[in-house]
A protein has these predicted regions:
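A surface-exposed, charged beta-strand/loop segment in the N-terminal or early-internal portion
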Residues: 1-74
Length: 74
């Protein structure tokens, strides 16, 4: 499954060395949780501050499972 939407970052949790788990509120899909690989790197860290508006791409193997986000700051 794949979707693209705009949303606001509600929270983030550090996971492993370079990854984070984020919770976002999107316009079409509501509240969603997923992982961002490399989210705690120097280049990506500034994008993931609580309250930022993001353009999100979400991918998952199953609709009911947590997916993986890639994002851009709007």
């Amino acid at each position: 499954m794949h979707w693209k939407d705009e949303g606001y970052l509600l929270s983030k949790i550090n996971y492993d060395e370079n990854s984070i788990i984020i919770e976002v509120f999107t316009l079409e899909h509501g509240k969603c949780t997923g992982m961002v690989y490399g989210g705690s790197s120097r280049k990506q860290k500034r994008n993931f501050q609580v309250g930022n508006k993001l353009l999100l791409n979400w991918r998952s193997k199953n609709v009911n499972k947590n997916g993986y986000f890639t994002s851009e700051l709007i």
